[in-house]
């Protein structure tokens, strides 16, 4: 949306801690090293600048300013490392907030899923195939943890093989929402189904070029992207089978 302005305010102890006006003041101090000059640049009075800084320091978990006395230019004021990180966090939250607002226009993004929404507005990945699902079960097979993930629209769970340490680090439990990613070269195409092959589905070739094919699972319109090495071997609308190895699927989740 054009001309959209989203103002971020952070409160601590039920009192205003930081807002756009205070952020600008801190950034001016960061640039010039002088509260007096920073107040002029931020177009506020010196007294108002001091009032803002005093109010922030009063409730801040750590000091925001450090005074340097003496020296060639008579000293000045600098931001503490905590204040610099606070500004970085504020910028990050502003960008995240703006991205989040823009996905309101994309009705394909469900807003009742934090993982889905977060991934859509912040995650950039080279993996062409990205799906969201929920953990159905976990099994230990040959010292590996095989995670079954239910993906809406697929007849059987996608199986992902990860280490037991990864399972613990991701805090996987039944029904936890996860994201699955795998690159196009990892999607293998065959004319007939393979025996004892997990993650195998019948699909139709929707589009085809010299490098890749878009394959559609007819029952739910879920699409996969696969790299092709011999495009002349396949035809549009041809029914084929695809499979993805368990260890070539990346599993991600929110903490």
Swiss-Prot record:
Q: Where is this region: I?
A: 1-121
Positions of the region Required for dimer formation and molybdate binding?
125-133
Tell me the superkingdom of the source: Bacteria
Q: What is its main location?
A: cytoplasm
GO CC terms? cytoplasm
* GO MF term set: cis-regulatory region sequence-specific DNA binding; DNA-binding transcription factor activity; molybdenum ion binding
Q: Mop domain: from which residue to which, for each copy? A: 124-191, 194-253
UniProtKB keywords = Activator, Cytoplasm, DNA-binding, Molybdenum, Repeat, Repressor, Transcription, Transcription regulation, Transport
Q: Which GO terms describe its biological process?
A: molybdate ion transport; regulation of DNA-templated transcription
Residues annotated to bind DNA: 34-80
Subcellular localization, as worded in the UniProt entry = Cytoplasm
PANTHER family given in the database record: DNA-BINDING TRANSCRIPTIONAL DUAL REGULATOR MODE, TRANSCRIPTIONAL REGULATOR MODE
What the protein does? The ModE-Mo complex acts as a repressor of the modABC operon, involved in the transport of molybdate. Upon binding molybdate, the conformation of the protein changes, promoting dimerization of ModE-Mo. The protein dimer is then competent to bind a DNA region, upstream of the modABC operon. Also acts as an enhancer of the expression of genes coding for molybdoenzymes, both directly and indirectly.
Tell me how this protein assembles: Homodimer.
Q: Which family does it belong to?
A: Belongs to the ModE family.
Q: Can you say what this protein is called?
A: Transcriptional regulator ModE
